[in-house]
């Protein structure tokens, strides 16, 4: 049952205060939001009704709201981390509710829903969404997710593919392997753990873990001596003690989850929107999703950070309505990448900095260079030696070795490499995300010990066939 938002006593019967229409935007966005949108107007939307229900999966209460014509196609909005909850979508809600039946909610642990120390994991949130939406709109709907909500939307579309007609994702958090994600998410998400470690001491933490799980592990190389993160997350006592807010629990669960298998199962056409200045969720994630999701389109919002709905509500509303209203056979829904085209042009960088490569090449050699970027390249072979290189959205199809990396540090995103050997690494550090490696002899050959991080990567060779999402050190002579 969804209660009409109105007299406070109707909700006090359930033991909680009546939710307010007025939300609280992040402080950096308040001026923009106040200038363009009155949150109190949400209550006056046609078909608006809201209230609290018994929260499936988690227990307690969950705030759920609907707006717009009930006989119109449904749009479900899934918010990200932060206690604003569904209020983050308020600036775009009037535009959506004019044409669509909109369902939004505060996920358990956030906003006006019950806060606790439950396991706020992606899988449990997906079950919650399935139950809540199923009670209100059985059948296919359009699914929109922001930040953590974007990751939940992906997992939902993979888990219940018949439910989702289209996806729209904004600044998706998570997805990358936790080591690749560490610089901008891991430490922020575990701020409380570090504080507790400094207060109670590592011995006390180890004692609690030993009692709960009979084992201890370091937090990989990030925080030597810290508790194992999965034990911390899944043990009720440790979770309540050290992860003392739903945001921290949900953030840690998000970082530790592996969304690669889900991404491979998503079939819904997808638009991806990203704020140019997002310091929380890397654009690299958007490139991975664009490359690995079928019929996906990627758009940058130049004036936005992590919350485009707040900083550019008019632009986001326009893009949302454009996407939702497109015919199923529109080229923006069915577009496929162009085929690899041969070229006789060769590219070379030697002892230089800041060089950029784009377009078609027979081969590219990078020797002793720093700050080199390859973007939208199609080539027959690439050699990187003693260099610092970023490679994005690149295809290499070789007769011998597609990509050879020697004594270098390379970040590779949304690329395809194929050849007798797809990747040959010697004494290098390579961070791969959304990369497919296809080798007739080997997908990966290690000529010298190398460190590699794999996020949502594919490997196809006579030696191995499958999915890579791990951080490993590979010894000389390894073939995969």
Placement of each model-derived feature along the sequence:
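Alpha/beta-hydrolase fold catalytic core
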Residues: 2-3, 12, 21-76, 99-100, ...
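Conserved HGGG/HGGXW glycine-rich cap/lid loop of the alpha/beta-hydrolase fold
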Residues: 67-112
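Active-site loop/oxyanion-hole signature of alpha/beta-hydrolase fold enzymes
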Residues: 104-144
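Flexible "cap/lid" loop of the alpha/beta hydrolase fold
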Residues: 158, 167-200
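Hydrophobic, aromatic-rich cap/lid helix
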Residues: 231-259
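Acidic catalytic loop of the alpha/beta-hydrolase fold
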Residues: 254, 277-281
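Short beta-strand/loop motif that positions the catalytic acidic residue
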Residues: 266, 272-274, 278
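Glycine-rich beta-solenoid repeat tracts in large extracellular/virion proteins
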Residues: 355, 362-367, 380-385, 401-406, ...
């Amino acid at each position: 049952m969804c209660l009409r938002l109105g007299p406070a006593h109707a909700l006090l019967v359930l033991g909680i205060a009546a939710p307010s229409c007025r939300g609280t935007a992040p402080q950096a966005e308040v001026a923009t939001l106040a200038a363009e949108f009155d949150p109190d107007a949400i209550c006056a939307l046609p078909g608006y009704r809201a209230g609290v229900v018994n929260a499936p999966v988690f227990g307690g209460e969950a705030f759920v709201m609907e707006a717009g014509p009930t006989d119109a196609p449904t749009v479900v909005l899934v918010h990200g981390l932060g206690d604003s909850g569904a209020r983050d979508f308020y600036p775009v809600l009037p535009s959506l509710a004019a044409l669509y039946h909109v369902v939004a909610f505060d996920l358990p642990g956030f906003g006006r829903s019950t806060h606790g120390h439950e396991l706020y994991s992606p899988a449990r949130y997906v079950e919650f969404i399935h139950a809540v939406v199923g009670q209100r709109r059985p059948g296919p709907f359009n699914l929109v997710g922001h930040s953590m909500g974007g990751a939940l939307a992906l997992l939902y579309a993979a888990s219940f593919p018949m439910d989702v007609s289209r996806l729209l994702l904004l600044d998706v958090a998570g997805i990358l392997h936790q080591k690749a994600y560490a610089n901008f998410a891991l430490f922020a998400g575990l701020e409380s753990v570090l504080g507790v470690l400094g207060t109670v001491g590592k011995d006390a933490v180890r004692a609690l873990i030993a009692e709960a799980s009979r084992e201890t592990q370091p937090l990989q190389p990030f925080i030597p001596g810290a508790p194992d993160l999965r034990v911390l997350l899944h043990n009720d006592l440790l979770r309540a003690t050290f992860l003392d807010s739903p945001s921290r629990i949900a953030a840690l669960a998000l970082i530790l989850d592996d969304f690669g298998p889900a991404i491979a199962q998503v079939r819904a056409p997808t638009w991806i929107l990203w704020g140019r200045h997002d310091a929380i969720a890397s654009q690299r994630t958007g490139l991975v999703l664009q490359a690995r999701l079928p019929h996906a389109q990627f758009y940058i919002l130049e004036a936005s950070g992590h919350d485009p709905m707040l900083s550019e509500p008019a632009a986001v509303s326009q893009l949302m309505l454009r996407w939702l209203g497109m015919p199923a056979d529109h080229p923006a829904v069915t577009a496929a990448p162009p085929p690899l085209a041969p070229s006789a042009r060769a590219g070379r960088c030697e002892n230089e900095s800041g060089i950029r490569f784009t377009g078609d090449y027979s081969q590219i050699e990078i020797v002793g260079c720093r700050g080199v970027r390859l973007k939208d390249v199609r080539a027959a072979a690439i050699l990187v030696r003693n260099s610092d290189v970023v490679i994005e959205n690149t295809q290499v199809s070789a007769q011998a070795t597609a990509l050879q990396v020697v004594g270098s540090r390379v970040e590779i995103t949304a690329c395809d490499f194929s050849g007798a050997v797809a990747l040959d690494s010697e004494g290098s550090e390579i961070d791969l995300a959304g990369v497919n490696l296809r080798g007739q002899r080997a997908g990966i050959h290690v000529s010298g010990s190398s460190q590699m991080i794999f996020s949502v990567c594919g490997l196809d060779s006579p030696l191995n066939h499958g999915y890579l999402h791990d951080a490993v050190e590979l010894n000389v002579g390894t073939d995969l």
